[in-house]
């Protein structure tokens, strides 16, 4: 004896209807459309591939070789190298106070 079908399984349900996993399994087994699933029509194109718009990223060994070949950075007139901790102290909120000796 066959079980009576629920209205969601016999007719395509809307995208907002909630469907249980058992109902989804039943729809898949019957070859029916799944509710809320967008069907994409993807086809292979056998023509010329499109050109990349982004520049190629260097491989890690290429990036290391490039870094070694670049000249060392130079300072601009009127600037000094930052000492470690100096930048953090200058940008800390004024409500932060150091405590202790």
From Swiss-Prot:
<comment type="function">
    <text>May be a peroxin involved in the PTS2-mediated protein import pathway.</text>
</comment>
<dbReference type="InterPro" id="IPR039995">
    <property type="entry name" value="PEX39"/>
</dbReference>
<dbReference type="GO" id="GO:0005777">
    <property type="term" value="C:peroxisome"/>
</dbReference>
<protein>
    <recommendedName>
        <fullName>Peroxisomal biogenesis factor 39</fullName>
    </recommendedName>
</protein>
<keyword id="KW-0576">Peroxisome</keyword>
<dbReference type="Pfam" id="PF17733">
    <property type="entry name" value="KPWE_dom"/>
</dbReference>
<dbReference type="InterPro" id="IPR040554">
    <property type="entry name" value="KPWE_PEX14_dom"/>
</dbReference>
């Amino acid at each position: 004896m066959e079980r009576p079908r629920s209205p969601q399984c016999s007719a395509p349900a809307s995208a907002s209807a909630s469907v249980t996993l058992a109902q989804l399994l039943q729809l898949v087994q019957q070859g029916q459309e799944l509710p809320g699933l967008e069907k994409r029509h993807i086809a292979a194109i056998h023509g010329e591939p499109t050109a990349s718009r982004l520049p190629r990223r260097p491989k890690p060994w290429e990036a290391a070789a490039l870094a070694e070949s670049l000249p060392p950075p130079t300072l601009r007139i009127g600037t000094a190298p930052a000492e470690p901790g100096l930048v953090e102290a200058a940008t800390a909120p004024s409500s932060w106070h150091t405590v202790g000796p």
